[in-house]
């Protein structure tokens, strides 16, 4: 029987058991001698030296297992000032030191993109942040490039074109490059012994030979244009995606301009697990292998690599704390945003809360991403000759003829909106009575709709959804609009000349009668 005042609430959720702290009797799980100072997982307590060896080995193993970076290559380190990218720069700095057992063999540089205008920072705060950034990067000894995000308004349209890529090196080619590099270092070492004054400068990485690129104050017009662009976007999800896209375009442009073949990013295992779930929710499932894999070759001549993808955020925080890795705090575009403000924030809260209850959540999602293979869909055009998304540069793997897909439904919706707009257009002129002004507003509206359709048809499904939150194309950087127009013109010219080209089947059909006539003439003894 039910009783008044009876509490029918469910049982209260139990909080996860606290992580056991290392006691005085507990020893390091690696050396079994030192006192543990860090507990990564339950039962995995490391002393200071063993934790450092464990952390460094992860970084070196990720680079050595993939063998994407060849000796002597110029590598650009994308540094945001956060914990993961700061730890990555620190690992490279220690790997190039003379005390390292196995020295890294590439030539590094660092890039920092100032995103203060997009995040709403004041000019005074940006100046203070840049001063701290230059101080930290100056202590590394690497050539660094500090650029403002406003410079995207002066980028060339070639940034959105996939450059020609050399074929991937084989195992033998990598070994040959290592042997050649070691011989070169041996020759330099011999010369250094003969003339120590001259050889001492040659043994060290030539960081001072390339001038460091620093940013001045960006133009007020560009700062205002960038602020207007991000203020016009309705949702935080679209803002974060556009910010990431513009940052990547600017980084790739700087890498190409200064001869860098690889770009290192500091995305950790935890961040990649969140990114995988976020991209799935945003309709980017076809590009997960590129967005979360070790290497990303979508730009062709510049390859993005993620050497920190095996480190969790917890390990990164412990390492930076124990060994004093410097970093710079800069507010992001989603700072102080509520949990449900964007898909990124929602997925981040979901993964991190699940990780507190089930400590294997991040590793499980991460291991799933490792199994993804960069195999395009059957019948999909890929590579330099195939169409790529105008913004994210991924292959357009959508099927325009399949109306059952979400992409087809989106295209049908866009077409119906255009037909509705045309049906509602008044027949009489509305812009003055002059001959030259008749129906000028309708022509302007038609041009805007044509430009919008030109942009939309060159985007993947995820970028199309995000572009819905942009009410107008006017705030976009000029290089995006210019490249969209050039692609549309090239497509129109290709369609016009297509009917004059002889296809392979027609050429074979024409070749068969010629071969038959030639064979018949040979049988009759007549030479053709």
From Swiss-Prot:
Annotated positions of the N-acetylcysteine modification: 2
Ranges of compositional bias, category Basic and acidic residues: 511-528
First-listed, main subcellular location of the protein, grouped into a coarse class: cytoplasm
Listed transmembrane segments: none
Intracellular or extracellular location(s): Cytoplasm
Molecular-function annotations in GO: nucleotidyltransferase activity; sulfurtransferase activity; tRNA binding
Keyword DNA-binding: no
Ranges of Polar residues composition bias in the record: 197-212
Region called Disordered, residue ranges: 1-23, 196-219, 504-528
Keywords attached to this entry: Acetylation, Cytoplasm, Phosphoprotein, tRNA processing
Cellular component per GO, a single term: cytosol
Coiled coil residues, start to end: none
InterPro entries assigned to the protein according to its UniProt record, in alphabetical order: CTU2 (IPR019407), Rossmann-like_a/b/a_fold (IPR014729)
Gene3D superfamilies: HUPs
UniProt keyword Aminoacyl-tRNA synthetase, yes or no: no
Sites bearing Phosphoserine, chain numbering: 416
GO BP term, pick one: tRNA thio-modification
Pathway(s) the chain acts in: tRNA modification; 5-methoxycarbonylmethyl-2-thiouridine-tRNA biosynthesis
A Pfam family: CTU2
Function in brief: Plays a central role in 2-thiolation of mcm(5)S(2)U at tRNA wobble positions of tRNA(Lys), tRNA(Glu) and tRNA(Gln). May act by forming a heterodimer with CTU1/ATPBD3 that ligates sulfur from thiocarboxylated URM1 onto the uridine of tRNAs at wobble position.
UniProt subunit comment: Component of a complex at least composed of URM1, CTU2/NCS2 and CTU1/ATPBD3.
Entry's family note: Belongs to the CTU2/NCS2 family.
Name of the protein in question: Cytoplasmic tRNA 2-thiolation protein 2
Gene: Ctu2
């Amino acid at each position: 029987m039910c009783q008044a005042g009876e509490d029918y609430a469910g049982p209260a959720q139990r909080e996860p058991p606290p992580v056991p702290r290392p006691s005085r009797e507990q020893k390091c799980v690696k050396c079994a001698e030192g006192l543990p100072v860090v507990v990564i997982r339950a039962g995995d307590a490391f002393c200071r030296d063993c934790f450092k060896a464990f952390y460094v080995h992860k970084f070196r193993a990720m680079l050595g297992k993939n063998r994407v970076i060849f000796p002597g290559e110029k590598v650009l380190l994308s540094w945001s000032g956060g914990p993961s990218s700061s730890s990555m720069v620190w690992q490279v700095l220690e790997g190039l030191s003379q005390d390292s057992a196995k020295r890294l063999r590439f030539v590094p540089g660092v890039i920092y993109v100032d995103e203060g205008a997009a995040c709403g920072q004041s000019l005074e705060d940006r100046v203070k942040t840049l001063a701290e950034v230059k101080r930290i990067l100056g202590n590394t000894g690497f050539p660094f490039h500090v650029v403002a995000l406003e410079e995207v308004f002066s980028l060339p349209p070639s940034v959105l074109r996939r450059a020609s890529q050399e074929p991937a090196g084989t195992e033998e080619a990598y070994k040959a490059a290592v042997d050649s590099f070691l011989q070169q270092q041996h020759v330099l070492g011999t010369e250094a012994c003969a003339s120590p004054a001259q050889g001492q400068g040659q043994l060290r990485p030539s960081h001072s030979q390339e001038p460091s690129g620093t940013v001045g104050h960006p133009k007020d017009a560009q700062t205002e244009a960038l602020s207007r662009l991000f203020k016009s976007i309705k949702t935080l999800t679209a803002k974060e995606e556009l910010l990431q896209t513009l940052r990547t375009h600017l980084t790739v442009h700087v890498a190409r301009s200064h001869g860098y073949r690889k770009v290192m990013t500091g995305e950790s295992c935890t961040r990649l697990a969140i990114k995988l779930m976020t991209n799935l929710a945003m309709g980017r499932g076809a590009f997960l292998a590129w967005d979360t894999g070790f290497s990303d070759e979508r730009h062709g001549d510049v390859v993005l690599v993620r050497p920190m993808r095996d480190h969790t955020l917890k390990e990164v925080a412990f390492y930076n704390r124990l060994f004093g890795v410097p970093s710079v705090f800069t507010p992001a575009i989603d700072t102080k945003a509520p949990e449900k403000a964007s898909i990124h924030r929602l997925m981040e809260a979901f993964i991190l809360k699940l990780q507190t209850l089930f400590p294997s959540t991040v590793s499980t999602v991460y291991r799933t991403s490792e199994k993804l293979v960069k195999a395009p869909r059957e019948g999909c055009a890929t590579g330099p000759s195939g169409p790529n998304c105008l913004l994210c540069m991924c292959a357009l793997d959508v099927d325009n003829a399949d109306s059952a897909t979400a992409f087809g439904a989106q295209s049908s919706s866009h077409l119906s909106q255009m037909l509705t707009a045309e049906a509602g257009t008044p027949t009489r002129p509305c812009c003055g009575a002059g001959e030259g002004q008749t129906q000028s507003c309708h022509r302007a509206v038609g041009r805007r709709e044509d430009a919008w359709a030109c942009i939309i048809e060159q985007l993947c499904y995820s970028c199309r959804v995000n572009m819905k939150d942009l009410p107008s194309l006017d705030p976009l950087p000029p290089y995006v609009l210019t490249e969209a127009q050039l692609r549309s013109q090239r497509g129109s010219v290709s369609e016009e000349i297509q009917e004059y080209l002889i296809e392979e089947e027609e050429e074979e059909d024409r070749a068969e009668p010629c071969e038959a006539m030639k064979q018949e003439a040979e049988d009759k003894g007549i030479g053709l």
